UniProtKB/Swiss-Prot annotation:
Misc remark: Mediates the renal secretion of many clinically used cationic drugs. Transports drugs such as diabetes treatment medicine metformin and neurotoxins 1-methyl-4-phenylpyridinium (MPP(+)), famotidine, ranitidine, amantadine, acriflavine, amiloride, memantine, cimetidine, cisplatin, oxaliplatin, platinum-based drugs cisplatin and oxaliplatin, 3'-azido-3'-deoxythymidine (AZT) and tetraethylammonium (TEA). Mediates the bidirectional transport of MPP(+). Metformin competitively inhibits OCT1-mediated thiamine uptake, leading to a decrease in hepatic steatosis.
Listed Pfam families: Sugar_tr
Regulation: Tyrosine phosphorylation of the transporter leads to activation of the transport activity. Inhibited by cGMP, most likely through a cGMP-binding protein that interacts with OCT2.
Extracellular side: 43-150, 199-210, 260-263, 370-375, 426-432, 486-494
InterPro entries (alphabetical): MFS_dom (IPR020846), MFS_sugar_transport-like (IPR005828), MFS_trans_sf (IPR036259), Orgcat_transp/SVOP (IPR004749), Sugar_transporter_CS (IPR005829)
GO CC entries: apical plasma membrane; basal plasma membrane; basolateral plasma membrane
Protein topology in the membrane: Multi-pass membrane protein
Record-annotated disulphide pairs: none
Name of protein: Solute carrier family 22 member 2
Length: 555
């Protein structure tokens, strides 16, 4: 009798030595995705800066000024309402090479009042207050060119979008292993080339290429590890695969602290990809994919290898494998199926909004922390730590309480934390950090749960399409986020947090409109998906229960 891979793994080991070995190898892949996803915090760090004015350095040296005195005497003030632009993007139109300038308040010798001196653009570049370097300091991505930093981060999310859309087809067509190794190789090459890019344009091109393949490779790793384990372990393994990403956040903070120059940082975080090429000899092809390609003999050989590694033996009867697919009529899904009926249309709209919101808040909070934090390395490290309890809370709650309430609560906590942080005064920095960490934990939980629930709300024949369409909003959000964060902070540092707060609270409220999926079988048809939120009052079932009740006394 034909059996499925899950049936065989029950005898050959669902999560034993082989699967643990594969998980460790693929978890390393998950951890190295971190620098591409949120590395903008360190690669694009914008330090305090001011216009470079010819003659100022010589005058400062002659007068023996301290850095604070040089800043006070030669640089425009911050402007009204604490606006930083005049200080950072303008300079006095003064010839500092004049010998008439004294060493004590040199501008006082001019006939014009200091506040009325004309300001000009930074023609000679900028002076940056940092011992290291970033793409901002090297390519002068400040003032009129600051939008180029937004474009840099948006480009990697554009790559994520197209890479994620195409990876499902490519992995199904050519296999998981070949696709994984190809993405790793391209990612490694593009990462090194970006580290040695001579111009901003070339750097942008190689970052886009990294985006095209890096998230795709991360997703293939996720697919592989969930296909190697038995059905009972898939959800837990999937969550811990993303915990490995969190470990990558902690490592990234340490590496960035040790390597404050962006080219060395980019080169270092790219190096592990060359190690992953050795996976050619370590990781086999997915047996499930081989069966889908009618390569049952090779699939059986790999499964026997898995059983041997696990110290298990397979019964002689388990020799004929089949896919876990129904033999019924094949349906061709379309986007219209996601919006044709009222309940599925509601599910689609809410899921798309929540994917978008999760991406905007998760990436946005990290970017905003890089702008507002006192110590970006420690702030980044501490905020990453809260992702561990977030994963633990998901594991504890989703099968006990359900999906809907933890999901809604996590969105609302994230939104409320963002709004609360706006009104905390600057001298209570410790409280601001605690509230920010709560927000980060909330949105991390929401991000994880939406991945799980997305597949549980759609019927079988449109499930994959629904997941791909809805999750694509995650990358759309990632494209918008850098423009949202960096442009709004130019108006007011806390303004992005107000936007994040509203988005999070609305997302939490919308989640409550979705049905609970805990303990429910995955819907097979549109009718089942439409009736998920309604109690079933089936007449035949009622008659059956009545007959069953009457039969009991007769026995």
């Amino acid at each position: 009798m034909p059996t499925t891979v899950d049936d065989v793994l029950e005898h050959g080991g669902e999560f034993h030595f082989f699967q643990k070995q594969m998980f460790f190898l693929l978890a390393l892949l998950s951890a190295t995705f971190t620098p591409i996803y949120v590395g903008i915090v360190f690669l694009g760090f914008t330090p305090d800066h001011r216009c470079r004015s010819p003659g100022v350095a010589e005058l400062s040296l002659r007068c023996g000024w301290s850095p604070a005195e040089e800043l006070n005497y030669t640089v425009p003030g911050p402007g009204p309402a604490g606006e930083a632009s005049p200080r950072q993007c303008g300079r006095y139109e003064v010839d500092w090479n004049q010998s008439a300038f004294g060493c004590v308040d040199p501008l006082a010798s001019l006939d014009t009042n200091r506040s009325r001196l004309p300001l000009g653009p930074c023609r000679e570049g900028w002076v940056y207050e940092t011992p290291g370097s970033s793409i901002v300091t090297e390519f002068n991505l400040v003032c009129a060119n600051s939008w180029m930093l937004d474009l840099f981060q948006a480009s990697v999310n554009v790559g994520f979008f197209f890479g994620s859309v195409s990876i499902g087809y490519i992995a199904d067509r050519f296999g998981r292993k070949l696709c994984l190794l190809t993405t790793v190789l391209i990612n490694a090459a593009a990462g090194v080339l970006m580290a040695i890019s001579p111009t901003y344009t070339w750097m942008l091109i190689f970052r886009l290429i990294q985006g095209l393949v890096s998230k795709a490779g991360w997703l293939i790793g996720y697919i592989l590890i969930t296909e190697f384990v038995g059905r009972r372990y898939r959800r837990t393994v999937g969550i811990f695969y993303q915990v490995a990403y969190t470990v990558g956040l902690l490592v990234l903070a340490g590496v960035a602290y040790a390597l404050p120059h962006w080219r060395w940082l980019q080169f270092t975080v790219t190096l592990p990809n060359f190690f992953f090429l050795l996976y050619y000899w370590c990781i086999p092809e997915s047996p499930r994919w081989l069966i889908s390609q009618n390569k049952n003999a090779e699939a059986m050989r790999i499964i026997k290898h898995i059983a041997k590694k696990n110290g298990k033996s397979l019964p002689a009867s388990l020799q004929c494998l089949r896919l876990e697919e129904e033999t019924g009529e094949k349906l061709n899904p379309s986007f219209l199926d996601l919006v044709r009926t009222p309940q599925i249309r509601k599910h689609t709209m809410i899921l798309m909004y929540n994917w978008f919101t999760s991406s905007v808040l998760y990436q946005g909070l990290i970017m905003h922390m890089g702008l507002a934090g006192d110590n970006i390395y420690l702030d980044f490290f501490y905020s990453a730590l809260v992702e561990f309890p977030a994963a633990f809370m998901i594991i504890v709650t989703i099968d006990r309480i359900g999906r809907r309430y933890p999901w809604a609560a996590s969105n609302m906590v994230a939104g409320a934390a963002c709004l609360a942080s706006v009104f905390i005064p600057g001298d209570l920095q410790w409280l601001k950090i605690i509230i920010s960490c709560l927000g980060r934990m909330g949105i991390t939980m929401a991000y994880e749960i939406v991945r799980l629930v997305n597949a549980e709300l759609y019927p079988t024949f449109i499930r994959n399409l629904g997941v791909h369409i809805c999750s694509s909003m995650c990358d759309i959000g990632g494209i918008i986020t850098p423009f949202l964060v960096y442009r709004l902070t130019n108006i007011w540092l806390e303004l992005p947090l107000m936007v994040f707060g509203v988005l999070g609270l609305v997302a939490g409220g919308l989640v409550l409109l979705l049905p609970e999926t805990k303990g429910k079988a995955l819907p097979e048809t549109i009718e089942e998906a439409e009736n998920m939120q309604r109690p079933r009052k089936n007449k035949e079932k009622m008659i059956y229960l009545q007959v069953q009740k009457l039969d009991i006394p007769l026995n």
